């Protein structure tokens, strides 16, 4: 069982993610904005973060950058969930150090597989040592 922080401002989607991940055996902590999300990450040292790019207070890009610049959080895998599946978004999140980008709506099986893949291959993010 992994501890996962989910940061998503769409509360119905956030609840759906919580149900899917808990059903897959994970401990799930949720946050509806970036400030609460950062607090949850710092307080709980999760194994993985699911992050919507469009959350209040900090956008997802700023959030990834903040996570990668903090020694306590830099090696936590971040999977980005977004409705923006364009090449520019994909390139930018990967350059910032996100492990994966999944486009909404995401199928449950694909999400679980992506999470399991990241949990099975945790390693430091390049250039962020």
Task: Say what each PLM segment does.
Residues 33-36, 59-65:
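Acidic catalytic/metal-coordinating carboxylates
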Residues 14, 56, 74, 86, ...:
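The feature encodes the CheY-like receiver
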Residues 106-115:
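C-terminal output helix
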């Amino acid at each position: 069982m992994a501890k996962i922080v989910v940061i998503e401002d769409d509360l119905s989607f956030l609840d759906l993610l919580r149900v899917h991940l808990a059903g897959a055996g994970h401990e799930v902590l949720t946050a509806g904005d970036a400030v609460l999300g950062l607090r949850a990450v710092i307080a709980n040292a999760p194994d993985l973060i699911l992050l919507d790019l469009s959350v209040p207070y900090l956008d997802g890009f700023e959030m990834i950058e903040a996570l990668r610049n903090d020694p306590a959080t830099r090696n936590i895998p971040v999977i980005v969930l977004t409705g923006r599946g364009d090449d520019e978004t994909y390139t930018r999140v990967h350059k910032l150090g996100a492990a994966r980008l999944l486009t909404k709506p995401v199928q449950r099986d694909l999400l679980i597989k992506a999470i399991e893949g990241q949990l099975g291959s945790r390693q430091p993010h390049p250039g962020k040592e």
